[in-house]
């Protein structure tokens, strides 16, 4: 409980600056990086339907260690989803420390954003909004995977037919949140050196472009794949 209080106040009981917020920031970054990488892999995985149902089922079989046991061990993907869910909830808890605590703080930040018109601040705003949406949407999706049994192309196609709007929205939320998060991780943890501030800003913009292009391309492919899922 003491560590929890220190994490929010930033001070220890003796008045000295606590290291807890820094530790929480580090773990927030680690869990965020894991989830952002998982989203990249997830988009590639779901997009294999573009190569046909057999290709998708083959990837599922590989993930379920069919090459080791001779048959698909379906519970492996459920365990992976459970681990990702734990990482996801941990990341959400750590990230909520920086969310507006009440409506007044929400209005203050929105006014601050509108006055500054600073791109990185606006990006954080989108990350905040998509993070809030993902807390519910991604949780529902992961819980469905954890308790949904064996995954195959036919079962996934049925799910897309029933919840096509949900999956489209989930894709948008994931891509926006993860791409902004990866860019912010780069800015936060990677040293950006330069002769002057213009060179530093140029390097930062280059990193931003690379991150957004990677996620953007995979998102477009995944979006096309979503329409293919619906057509099956």
Regions found by a protein language model. Give the residues of each.
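Membrane-embedded alpha-helical bundles that constitute the cytochrome b-like, heme-associated redox core
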Residues: 1-232
């Amino acid at each position: 409980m003491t560590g929890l209080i220190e994490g929010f106040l930033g001070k220890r009981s003796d008045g000295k600056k606590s290291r807890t917020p820094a530790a929480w920031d580090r773990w927030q970054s680690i869990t965020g990086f894991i989830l952002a990488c998982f989203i990249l892999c997830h988009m590639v995985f779901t997009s294999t339907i573009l190569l046909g149902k057999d290709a998708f089922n083959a990837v599922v079989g590989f993930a379920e260690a069919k090459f080791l046991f001779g048959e698909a061990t379906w519970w492996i993907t459920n365990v992976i989803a459970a681990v990702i869910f734990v990482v996801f909830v941990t990341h959400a808890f750590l990230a909520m420390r920086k969310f507006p605590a009440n409506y007044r703080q929400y209005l203050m930040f929105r006014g601050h954003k509108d006055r500054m018109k600073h791109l990185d601040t606006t990006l954080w705003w989108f990350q905040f909004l998509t993070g809030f949406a993902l807390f519910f949407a991604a949780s529902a999706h992961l819980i469905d995977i954890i308790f949904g049994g064996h995954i195959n192309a036919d079962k996934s196609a049925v799910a897309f037919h029933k919840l096509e709007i949900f999956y489209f929205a989930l894709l948008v939320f994931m891509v926006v949140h993860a791409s902004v998060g990866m860019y912010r991780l780069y800015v936060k943890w990677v040293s950006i050196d330069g002769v002057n501030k213009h060179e530093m800003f140029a390097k930062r913009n280059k990193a931003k472009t690379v991150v957004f292009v990677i996620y953007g391309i995979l998102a477009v492919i995944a979006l096309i794949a979503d329409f293919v899922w619906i057509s099956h």
